[in-house]
Amino acid sequence: MADSFELIVTRKEPVLVSPASETPKGLHYLSNLDQNIAIIVKTFYYFKSNSRSNEESYEVIKKSLSEVLVHYYPAAGRLTISPEGKIAVDCTGEGVVVVEAEANCGIEKIKKAISEIDQPETLEKLVYDVPGARNILEIPPVVVQVTNFKCGGFVLGLGMNHNMFDGIAAMEFLNSWAETARGLPLSVPPFLDRTLLRPRTPPKIEFPHNEFEDLEDISGTGKLYSDEKLVYKSFLFGPEKLERLKIMAETRSTTFQTLTGFLWRARCQALGLKPDQRIKLLFAADGRSRFVPELPKGYSGNGIVFTYCVTTAGEVTLNPLSHSVCLVKRAVEMVNDGFMRSAIDYFEVTRARPSLTATLLITSWAKLSFHTKDFGWGEPVVSGPVGLPEKEVILFLPCGSDTKSINVLLGLPGSAMKVFQGIMDI
């Protein structure tokens, strides 16, 4: 892509797409796990078919959305605050915001941006931002943009509220939507009732919940982030590189545990954290199969819980890689039914959300089926996130149908990114 080229996207007026038939009204309960991450997750999906042009893309997307919203009717409502002071959904049925748009080029002009996913300023143009929205309550749970390109392909850009869907639930919603577009029944109908995860009465906090601890920045990291431009990079970890990491770790561990320990250590080194800086690692563990009983198939809410390590930067950077990998392993092993229900009850008592000061938050989308959504134009040629929700986040991403590789996306201040890149050469 030539550096001088600028993607220009011309949007039409947004419309509201409501469920195709009457749906239940009233307040829809969101669990305490749904309260944790009040952010909009932005993703894009590029479709191109040799046998079907993009002329009807907007109408197909709109019609199938209207039909699938009958099953996922809370997504057509609006977020509100419940009488208990928590985020809930007012099931108004008013609909999802959908925007039709045209790009000034074929997709080849932005090939680098969409394949390396490290140019959020370009990708942001493919997802609609609700103008004037001051907070999460003023943004509909789902926002859709369909952008047609001159090459005959189109991009489906989505903004989805994390209070409504975690990654697994979002992929199941998208899959249901794509099945509807192809005239198929839903292979996994949604299970909408989130009261399964109500807090206990009375609440029982049985574990320390340091994931919510607010740490002090004594290393000047906040100033570094404000003084320097954030640079985004993606790093591909293929099977051979991942195997080398496991050998370096000198301990029995999963790919996730090894890679997480390695990246945590590398980021601490790149940011030049003081040895006595208290730091935190947060990552989401899927609790669907760990709850007792397990959550039902198709559970359409947040089934993830945050687990954590809290230590000092020196403990991570001055010890061998095996030490940080073992810390990650211990955090994974903490997550069971008792820990997750204790976290639910902790929020009920404190209303605390995880603090991100001196924290790295790792989110793995590596096992999410980004590439399998077929709305009638075949599977996406390429898909992925639009930027990162917070500067403290590292994303693990799938590499299309290659299940043995992981693409790592992060942003760091320019000087720190140079150091980080050097550490990635293993």
From Swiss-Prot:
Enzyme nomenclature, EC number: 2.3.1.-
Gene3D superfamilies: Chloramphenicol acetyltransferase-like domain (3.30.559.10)
Keyword vocabulary terms for this entry: Acyltransferase, Cell wall biogenesis/degradation, Transferase
UniProt KW Cell wall biogenesis/degradation keyword: yes
Top-level EC class: transferase
Gene Ontology biological process: alkyl caffeate ester biosynthetic process; cell wall organization
Tissue note: Expressed in the outermost circumference of mature roots, the endodermis of young roots and in the seed coat of developing seeds. Expressed in outer integument layer 1 of the seed coat.
InterPro entries with a match to the protein in the record: CAT-like_dom_sf, Plant_Fungal_Acyltransferase
GO terms, molecular function: caffeoyl-CoA: alcohol caffeoyl transferase activity
Location of the active site: 162, 374
Keyword Cell wall biogenesis/degradation (UniProt): yes
GO cellular component, one term: plastid
Function: Involved in the synthesis of alkyl hydroxycinnamates in root waxes. Functions as a fatty alcohol:hydroxy cinnamoyl-CoA acyltransferase with apparent preference for caffeoyl-CoA.
Family, per entry: Belongs to the plant acyltransferase family.
Name by which UniProt lists this protein: Fatty alcohol:caffeoyl-CoA acyltransferase
Gene that this polypeptide is encoded by: FACT
